[in-house]
Amino acid sequence: MNRIIAYALVFSSPCLYAQAEATTQKEDPFQKLSESLVAKLPEHQKPIKLGVGNFVYGDTPMMSPLSVVIREELEIALPKSNQVKVITRSNLDQLEMEGEFQATELVEPGTAVEKVTVEGVEGIVRGRFVSDGTTVTLYTEIAWLQGGEVTKDKVTWKMNEVTARVWPEKSAEQAQEAVTPQNAEQSMAGIEEVTNAKLLNVRKDFDIQLKTADGERVYEEGSNISFKMKSPEACHVAVICHQSDGNSVVLFPNKWHKDTLIPKDHWVSIPGTLKSGFEIEIAEPFGSDVVQVIACTDQNALMKEIKGMASAATEDDPYPVMTRGMVVKKVKAATAADVSKQTLWSEKHIIVSTFPKG
């Protein structure tokens, strides 16, 4: 079963996790984290405007339910200090849409920070975490946009502190499953296979921007996902999900929408206003996948490359699927054959992590 499936109705996902009963500030690990970060802020008279970025697992791009919890809890805890004004993910997205800065890249931990002045935000809090089953160690950093510096911090929580705060109904084993990404070993192997096999080695004649419509990279079962892209060239696009199980799923174009053209210098969502008639919903199996957009200025050339995939679609399973090796052959054939460069190609990809409800 494909991980990403289209449905006709909009699904409104429930709250990600059950809120625990009120605890004291001393017992709240996220309040401790907030206080530790605030203590490292430079001297200031007005509240510092901080966005809260992504928190990934270890030295991987993968995320888990805890990734979402950390961000949401920090967005609540930081303003309580009266020293921080949190810039929400939607506001960061709006600043990026207006061309202020590349928020999609800066929310990722470890991304180099170039000096940039943005009126709406001064820094981004982001980080990585690891767990040994009894503790969770979080390595955070505040990336300062105007100066280009990074302020680092480290906190260690007891697993039972985290469990009592956000998953009081879970056993220790269940809590550990919520801390680590789904199918982490297989997913990471799949991600490495995609990059090492050079599936993404499409000729880049121009740069395109790609992000999820809501700026997230981790999604719960039943939630909808949409991809937003922008190109400096009018071009035709295909959206492909390279799954950890070795299959590659063509999400777009599909039986509900076949118009692949996106205009020059305009953000377009797939699915969205211009590309409507279908939705993409998160379903099992869960893990972390590479979602890739392939762009081409020649529709016939693009469609030729995905024609074989499209023939695999059925009424019950409308998204065509191909094995990894066949996709490698197609991508390499497309770039090798078009040596004239009269047809322009490009690609962009992101990692999306998913997990089940509960």
Where are these regions (language model features)?
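Sec-dependent N-terminal signal peptides
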Residues: 4-13
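Active-site-proximal beta-strand/loop segments in catalytic clefts of secreted hydrolases
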Residues: 53-55, 89-91, 128-129, 240-242, ...
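Short, charged beta->alpha transition segments
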Residues: 37-40, 112-113, 278-280
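Short, solvent-exposed, polar/charged sequence segments at loop or secondary-structure edges
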Residues: 61-75, 79-139
